[in-house]
């Protein structure tokens, strides 16, 4: 097959750039950026990268914390494979020029919810930005890597039962074209923009996951949508809610309700350091009992210099955008969609059920996160799986996936139950608000069945897309329906999925 490149990567986040830099320099590599090279969800990551680094920690402890957070649904073999590469991943990032914070005896490690010890390597509270800046410098030094900006991947091209490239939309001209490749990699992030309130940037419209579904790839665990407990309860900017890092609670931040009472000890023995799903549901429960739509996160009992040193971007944002000085005042917070725990089914090397197609980062479901992601495991997964993927591609290793049976689109026969309530008019804000209500932290059978019926109707009535926005809407609908169906099929309350009728 004549190809335009050896490896075609749709996405420009941490996993995508790590893969490109880890492949042999003899490979012809193309990176498709939906917007600019430096515009990606990875850049907004605050917390850090979890790895068993210190003398008081070890891989077994990290594995145990990950399995507990994942609520029994992690793939333990994948967990061990990925976490065992934590220290080499940090060392690789150091070699790329990432200047992690230091203490007197080495890396400065912080602690976050669900972790039993300090193991989070970080750069203040803007780790993602620092990491991405370093990798972009390295990318621009590689003549074998071509970067195409403002290019949107639309669909997977196949030949003889294997992926052979992508159909792409040039967002500058709205023209489509094909790129053929020996290896195709989807690394376009999650589906956060199906919700009205999300920490993800506007580009996270589930493009890669939707493409994979249309191509018949195996996907799994899409019901497990992680809601971060502490999004800033102020107006969002550019469709993205500002995140208040897990590390604020890790460094002693206290959650209080409208009455000024600390409430987390009533919900979990780990209090503010419980896993994200537990803290998010607890905050939602407290908000339901009070008149204000937020709770307070207070770190002001720590020395002001400590707060400014550890959380400079949070301090700066709250002061400039909200007039809040977090060294003296509590931060108003509420849960916000943050991460897609499921995705395209892969092994730890990123290999999917479709030959020559790979998926990495939040797009993929390796089994590491199970029903709920442990804080700061996602950036680690990006680096480790991308490096393993590079090795698999270079070595020509094949992955024999289990046969995949696409779930039937059940409940379509019941759509008539809600016929009086369904809306024919579709818009992105309407979809996002609808999903926030029915596919949010707290779900129920009636809401999920109504969601499936409504989403199927919108999907059936959708016109053929021609513009970038229309293609994004197609993907948002595809992903929304997949989440709703997965949530309805899950008859157990576990991790990030909670159905009051189960």
UniProtKB/Swiss-Prot annotation:
High-level lineage: Bacteria, Pseudomonadati, Pseudomonadota, Betaproteobacteria, Neisseriales
Functional summary from the UniProt entry: Catalyzes the oxidation of L-aspartate to iminoaspartate, the first step in the de novo biosynthesis of NAD(+).
Keyword Transport: no
Swiss-Prot/TrEMBL site (Important in orienting the L-aspartate substrate) positions: 112
Recorded catalytic activity of this chain's protein: L-aspartate + O2 = iminosuccinate + H2O2
MF GO annotations: L-aspartate oxidase activity; nucleotide binding
GO biological process, one term: 'de novo' NAD biosynthetic process from L-aspartate
Family: Belongs to the FAD-dependent oxidoreductase 2 family. NadB subfamily.
Catalytic residues as annotated in Swiss-Prot or TrEMBL: 276 (proton donor/acceptor)
Localization per record: Cytoplasm
GO cellular component: cytoplasm
Enzyme class (EC, first level): oxidoreductase
Binding site for FAD: 12-15, 34, 41-48, 207, 362, 378-379
The entry's keywords: Cytoplasm, FAD, Flavoprotein, Nucleotide-binding, Oxidoreductase, Pyridine nucleotide biosynthesis
Enzyme Commission designation: 1.4.3.16
Annotated cofactor note: Binds 1 FAD per subunit.
Gene3D superfamilies: FAD/NAD(P)-binding domain, Fumarate reductase/succinate dehydrogenase flavoprotein-like, C-terminal domain, Succinate dehydrogenase/fumarate reductase flavoprotein, catalytic domain
Designated name of the protein: L-aspartate oxidase
Main location: cytoplasm
InterPro entries: FAD-dep_OxRdtase_2_FAD-bd (IPR003953), FAD/NAD-bd_sf (IPR036188), Fum_R/Succ_DH_flav-like_C_sf (IPR037099), NadB (IPR005288), Succ_DH/fumarate_Rdtase_cat_sf (IPR027477)
Cofactor(s) the protein needs: FAD
Pathway(s) it belongs to: Cofactor biosynthesis; NAD(+) biosynthesis; iminoaspartate from L-aspartate (oxidase route): step 1/1
């Amino acid at each position: 097959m004549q190809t335009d490149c050896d490896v075609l990567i749709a996405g420009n986040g941490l996993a995508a750039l790590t893969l490109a830099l880890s492949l042999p320099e003899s490979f012809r590599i193309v990176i498709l950026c939906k917007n600019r090279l430096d515009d990606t969800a990875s850049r907004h990551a605050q917390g850090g990268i979890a790895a068993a680094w210190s003398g008081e920690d070890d891989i077994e402890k990290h594995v145990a914390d990950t399995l507990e957070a994942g609520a029994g649904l992690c793939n333990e073999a994948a967990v061990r494979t990925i976490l065992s590469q934590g220290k080499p991943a940090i060392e690789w990032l150091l070699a790329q020029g990432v200047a992690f914070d230091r203490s007197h005896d080495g890396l400065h490690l912080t602690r976050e919810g669900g972790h039993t010890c300090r193991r989070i390597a970080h750069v203040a509270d803007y780790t993602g930005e620092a990491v991405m800046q370093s990798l972009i410098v390295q990318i621009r030094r590689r003549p074998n890597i071509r970067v195409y900006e403002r290019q949107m991947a639309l669909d997977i091209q196949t030949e003889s039962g294997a992926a052979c490239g992508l159909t792409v939309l040039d967002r500058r001209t709205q023209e489509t074209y094909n790129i053929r490749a020996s290896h195709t990699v989807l690394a376009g992030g999650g589906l956060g923009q199906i919700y009205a309130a999300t920490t993800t940037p506007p580009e996270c419209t589930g493009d890669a996951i939707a493409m994979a579904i249309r191509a018949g790839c195996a996907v799994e665990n899409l019901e497990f949508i992680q809601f971060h407990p502490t999004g800033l309860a102020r107006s969002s900017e550019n469709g993205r809610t500002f995140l208040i890092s897990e590390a604020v609670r890790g460094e002693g931040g206290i959650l209080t309700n409208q009455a000024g009472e600390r409430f987390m000890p009533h919900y979990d023995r780990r209090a503010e350091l419980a896993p994200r799903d537990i803290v998010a549901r607890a905050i939602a429960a407290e908000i339901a009992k009070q008149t204000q739509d937020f709770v307070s996160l207070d770190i002001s009992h720590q020395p002001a210099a400590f707060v400014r040193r550890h959380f400079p971007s949070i301090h700066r944002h709250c002061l400039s955008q909200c007039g809040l000085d977090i060294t003296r005042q509590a931060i108003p917070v509420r849960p916000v969609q943050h991460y897609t725990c499921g995705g395209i089914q892969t092994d730890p090397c990123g290999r999917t059920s479709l030959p020559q197609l790979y998926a990495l980062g939040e797009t993929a479901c390796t089994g590491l996160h199970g029903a709920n992601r442990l804080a700061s495991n996602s950036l680690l997964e990006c680096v480790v799986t991308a490096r393993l993927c590079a090795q698999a591609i270079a070595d020509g290793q094949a992955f024999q996936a289990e046969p995949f049976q696409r779930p039937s689109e059940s409940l379509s026969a019941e759509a008539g139950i809600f016929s009086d309530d369904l809306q024919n008019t579709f818009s992105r804000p309407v979809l996002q608000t609808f999903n926030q209500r029915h596919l949010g932290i707290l779900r129920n059978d009636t809401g999920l069945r109504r969601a499936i019926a409504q989403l199927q109707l919108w999907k059936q009535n959708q016109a053929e897309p021609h513009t970038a926005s229309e293609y994004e809407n197609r993907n948002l609908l595809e992903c929304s329906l997949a989440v709703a169906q997965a949530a309805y099929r899950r008859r157990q309350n576990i991790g990030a999925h909670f159905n009051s009728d189960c």
